[in-house]
Amino acid sequence: MIFKLNVRGAILVAAAITGLVTLASPARADRCDDSAKELTNQVERLKVNFRAANVVYLSHPAAKELSVGCRGDKYSIELYAKGDRKPTPEFFSLVGSMAAIVFTVTKDDTTTGATRCLKRMGLLRGDKVVMRYRRLNMECTRTKTDASIAITRGKDE
């Protein structure tokens, strides 16, 4: 018995299998997109502004700037918030609830850490405070007009 090789049929079958495999696999969203979507669903008055590279920019009335960044060279995910020089309790609550959702830590812990970091800035410690609280790296900076906090988690954690 001699088998005849049908090239057209083989190519057609291979193309059909490839098409089925690509259609069957679900499209995966980026972790930044997932985090931003979860934040907007759970935090009131929070809106997504736009996405640029690995950063999703958000807006809220209690903060001047908000962003969620993913996959930096030294961190796996970052939350950045900027507010007035003297942050309000609403700002502390916003940062705490956002960090709790992004980093899956309790809201009390993240609010306490953010409050400690932002309140340590002053005459004795200066305008830049770096601290670690509950496996989160917090860096608070202050200028003449505003104060900001960047909360990150390292790649190895």
Task: Give the ranges of each region predicted by the language model.
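N-terminal secretory signal peptides
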Residues: 30-74
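Extracellular/mature segments of secreted proteins
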Residues: 38-43, 76-81, 124-128, 147-152
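Bacterial N-terminal signal peptides that target proteins for export
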Residues: 2-14
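Short, exposed beta-strand-loop hairpins at the edges of beta-sheets
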Residues: 128-155
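Cleavable N-terminal signal peptides
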Residues: 16-17, 27
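Sec/Tat signal peptide C-region and signal peptidase I cleavage site
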Residues: 23-29
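Short glycine-rich, low-complexity/disordered patches
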Residues: 27, 48-57, 104-134
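Long, charged/polar, surface-exposed segments that mediate recognition or autoinhibition
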Residues: 70-121
